[in-house]
Amino acid sequence: MGETMSKRLKLHLGGEAEMEERAFVNPFPDYEAAAGALLASGAAEETGCVRPPATTDEPGLPFHQDGKIIHNFIRRIQTKIKDLLQQMEEGLKTADPHDCSAYTGWTGIALLYLQLYRVTCDQTYLLRSLDYVKRTLRNLNGRRVTFLCGDAGPLAVGAVIYHKLRSDCESQECVTKLLQLQRSVVCQESDLPDELLYGRAGYLYALLYLNTEIGPGTVCESAIKEVVNAIIESGKTLSREERKTERCPLLYQWHRKQYVGAAHGMAGIYYMLMQPAAKVDQETLTEMVKPSIDYVRHKKFRSGNYPSSLSNETDRLVHWCHGAPGVIHMLMQAYKVFKEEKYLKEAMECSDVIWQRGLLRKGYGICHGTAGNGYSFLSLYRLTQDKKYLYRACKFAEWCLDYGAHGCRIPDRPYSLFEGMAGAIHFLSDVLGPETSRFPAFELDSSKRD
């Protein structure tokens, strides 16, 4: 008891120093202060009263009243994207030729160019994407099965690119090869984990991605159901072993640790199970997934952040992979599925933590960097239409416009999608169209688009 108390006291006293070590102090005023200053400056001179500006724009803010990004900010982002793309292409000349993953390798670069094609409709980006994915499809090794770190990523992205190019034969070949991985995924005797980066949830994402991007029925419902059932059975088994069936019906671990976050933990797994495309039945969602989410919710720190694992009492990490920026996506999806205000309220609390502590010294990337944290604001804006979150996303984008100027650590794979420059470019391109933005290799399209 005494040890726990001293641990918590130490955490409380060391909180600010810890934050400064891991994140920069956010230099931007929050939306209320920025919008308030604009209202004050737009007050009528003759009466001295405060009123909104008479124009349809909100001068000084990076967007108009309808949420469309202003032309000047669009131009700044487009210029920076062009500049960063040149740097990235130069840097990739010395990248690991054998890394085919979406996380740190060539599939991630293919995904970036696919995104730029989506945003601009410029065919040259689609062809660039094809160049990169062809490179990966020649080097599949069969060792891993997930979208982010295994063969499922190159195959799923390849299928989508070929589909967009109307090369249906090549697209179907990729789908067929992807489905051949399924046997090893659903085998309960295998030591495959359930998490997103290396486990079943990561393979499930690949199947859902195909049905979202190419069309329903690309992967048959029975194949998806088989993977979903394997994930659920695995969670029930561990919950039983840990005697947590009542409190947390679906419990998961990775390397013997019960992680919480999006990358290796329960937030990422529950998030995938709640996707409409996964077609998990309502009874399972209500009886198994919902109480498990609530169990994780109760592990929240007083700050509003979440631990990296159930056994960790240290409030340190504010990353998509560990902490509030990953858990927020689970909470938003829970709000959509269960329609309970508590989930939205806690997602908003996560957003406040990310705003305060999300400009990371680790860099600008997606997994554990500022761009990944910025995506949480875009997602919350799409859900609520509250301009506060669009403003926050734009401010994190503004930070990324000064890429390299803050003295951040240089990641091991500095040009990759999840650790480096490609991820920041992806985020910046999504800020141009917030309504259709999505976190790559994680969020799925809720609308049909080609």
UniProtKB/Swiss-Prot annotation:
The keyword ATP-binding does not apply. Gene3D superfamilies: 1.50.10.10. It is found in: Nucleus; Cytoplasm; Cell membrane. Pfam families: LANC_like (PF05147). A lipid is attached at G2 (N-myristoyl glycine). Necessary for abscisic acid (ABA) binding on the cell membrane and activation of the ABA signaling pathway in granulocytes. Its exogenous expression in a sarcoma cell line decreases the expression of ABCB1 (P-glycoprotein 1) and increases cellular sensitivity to an anticancer drug (adriamycin). This is LanC-like protein 2. The gene is LANCL2.
